[in-house]
Design a protein with these regions (language model features):
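Short, solvent-exposed amphipathic alpha-helical segments in soluble enzyme
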Residues: 1-6, 63-68, 90-91, 170-175, ...
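Active-site diphosphate/adenylate-binding microenvironment
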Residues: 120-204
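General beta-strand structural signal in soluble alpha/beta enzymes
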Residues: 10-12, 50-51, 94, 134, ...
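Conserved catalytic cysteine-centered active-site region
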Residues: 10-23, 172, 202-204
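Glycine-rich, acidic loop regions that bind phosphate or pyrophosphate groups
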Residues: 15-118
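Catalytic alpha/large subunits of respiratory electron-transfer oxidoreductases
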Residues: 1-12, 46-47, 152
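Thiamine diphosphate
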Residues: 37-47, 52-56, 165-225
Length: 225
């Protein structure tokens, strides 16, 4: 759908890795910890198609002002999620793949060159903050470099905390379901068990757990065993 209509895409934290980082119309993560261009696009869009989104406070912020210039189409397989946090204009309850396939078959190709150029220009001028030059290790630079070393096949698991958001922001996800994190419940100590489960399911792919001091403290006893 995005390719046919030249529609930009942004993701919530739970949606990261569903779109390859190098896709030309991908704007990155939205919300409190998101990229400036993703938030700019949402604020200035005249149509927002939300797929499986719950519009958490980290995404929507002030829910009464979220994308208030746009018509919102909310697609979700669970009817109870529709307009739960942010009121939508059109609700479509069902399987996202089937609904989007129907969209693709019904809509004509579009370009939206002016809108696309505006976002490209904005992204070029205002991006995520880059680590400062110096001899100190910056977590953002560490995460960015980690992707270079691991490549696109790795699955990244995080615990909960600042490291989680830095990993969400700066790691570059190329394959679906390569970012695993407890974003909704925010359960510290989640990471080790999740990483073991992921490795069991994908024994031939690199699996890396990125954790913080609090979450590490919750799992020290398991590591000692």
């Amino acid at each position: 759908y995005s390719k046919k209509t030249q529609t930009p895409i942004c993701c919530s934290a739970m949606g990261l890795s569903s779109v390859p980082y190098d896709y030309e119309l991908y704007l990155g993560m939205i919300g409190m910890h998101g990229t400036p261009v993703a938030n700019y696009a949402t604020l200035n869009a005249d149509l927002v198609i939300a797929i499986g989104a719950r519009f958490s406070d980290r995404v929507a912020g002030n829910r009464k002002k979220f994308a208030n210039a746009a018509q919102i189409i909310h697609i979700d397989i669970d009817a109870s999620e529709i307009s739960k946090n942010v009121a939508c204009d059109t609700a479509l309850v069902g399987d996202a793949k089937q609904i989007l396939t129907h969209f693709i078959n019904q809509i004509e190709e579009q370009k939206h060159e002016e809108w696309r150029n505006t976002l490209v220009d904005f992204r070029t001028k205002i991006g995520l903050k880059k680590p400062a030059e110096g001899d100190k290790v910056d977590p953002r630079d560490f995460i960015y470099t980690l992707h270079k070393l691991l490549g696109d096949d790795a699955i990244i698991v995080t615990d909960v905390g600042q490291h989680q958001m830095i990993t969400a922001q700066y790691y570059q996800y190329a394959k679906p379901r390569s970012f695993i994190s407890s974003c909704g419940l925010g359960t510290m100590g989640y990471g080790m068990g999740a990483a073991i489960g992921v490795k069991t399911a994908h024994p031939n792919r690199p699996v890396v757990l990125i954790t913080g001091d609090g979450s590490f403290h919750m799992n020290m006893n398991e590591m000692a065993c």
